[in-house]
C-alpha cells in the first residue's frame, strides 16, 4: 500500500512566504544583525543582502535582480551608485539599459525639409515677446 500523497499546493506555499517573509525582514532584530562576512568581502552572494539592507528605495533593483545579466564594469558601477545614493532610484534604474547603448539615430524629418524650431527671445525689460 502506498501512503497518501501530501503535496502542498504551490499557491499555499507562496502565500505563506508572502505573509511570513516581510515581517521577518522588517523586524528590529533583523535590522540589528551585524553585516555578514560575505558582505564585508564584497562577494557576489551578498547582492540581495545589500539590496535589502542598504539605504534608499530598492524595489526596482530587487524585482530585476534575477533578470539582469552581468554587464560591463561601467554599467555595474553606475548601478551600484544609483542603489547606494539616497532618494527614489526607480527612473534611473529602469532607463539605465537604454542609456548604456549608442546614441539613437537621428529621426528623418517629415516632408521635404525639417521644420525650423522657433527660439523665444527675451524682449527688453526682461519680458518675453509672447
Curated annotation (Swiss-Prot):
Modification after translation: Specific enzymatic cleavages at paired basic residues yield the different active peptides.
Residue(s) carrying Methionine amide: 96
GO MF: neuropeptide hormone activity; type 1 orexin receptor binding; type 2 orexin receptor binding
Any one biological process term the GO annotation gives: temperature homeostasis
Localization, UniProt: Rough endoplasmic reticulum; Cytoplasmic vesicle; Synapse
GO annotations of cellular component type: cytoplasmic vesicle; perinuclear region of cytoplasm; rough endoplasmic reticulum; synapse
Keywords: Amidation, Cleavage on pair of basic residues, Cytoplasmic vesicle, Disulfide bond, Endoplasmic reticulum, Neuropeptide, Pyrrolidone carboxylic acid, Signal, Synapse
Modified residues (Leucine amide): 65
Classification via InterPro entries: Orexin
Modified residues (Pyrrolidone carboxylic acid): 33
Propeptide: 97-130
Disulphide connectivity of cysteines: 38-44, 39-46
Key word Endoplasmic reticulum present: yes
Signal peptide interval: 1-32
Main localisation: endoplasmic reticulum
Pfam families in UniProt: Orexin
Family listed: Belongs to the orexin family.
Function of the protein: Neuropeptides that play a significant role in the regulation of food intake and sleep-wakefulness, possibly by coordinating the complex behavioral and physiologic responses of these complementary homeostatic functions. A broader role in the homeostatic regulation of energy metabolism, autonomic function, hormonal balance and the regulation of body fluids, is also suggested.
Protein name: Hypocretin neuropeptide precursor
Source organism of this protein record: Canis lupus familiaris (Dog)
Amino acid at each position: 500500500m502506498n501512503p497518501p500523497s501530501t503535496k502542498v499546493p504551490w499557491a499555499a506555499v507562496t502565500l505563506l512566504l508572502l505573509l511570513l517573509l516581510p515581517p521577518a525582514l522588517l523586524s528590529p532584530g533583523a535590522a540589528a544583525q551585524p553585516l555578514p562576512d560575505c558582505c564585508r568581502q564584497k562577494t557576489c552572494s551578498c547582492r540581495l543582502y545589500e539590496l535589502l539592507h542598504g539605504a534608499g528605495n530598492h524595489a526596482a533593483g530587487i524585482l530585476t535582480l534575477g533578470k539582469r545579466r552581468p554587464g560591463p564594469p561601467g554599467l555595474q558601477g553606475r548601478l551600484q551608485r544609483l542603489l547606494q545614493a539616497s532618494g527614489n532610484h526607480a527612473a534611473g534604474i529602469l532607463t539605465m539599459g537604454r542609456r548604456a547603448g549608442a546614441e539613437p539615430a537621428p529621426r528623418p524629418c517629415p516632408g521635404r525639409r525639417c521644420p525650423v524650431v522657433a527660439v523665444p527671445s527675451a524682449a527688453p525689460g526682461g519680458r518675453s515677446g509672447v
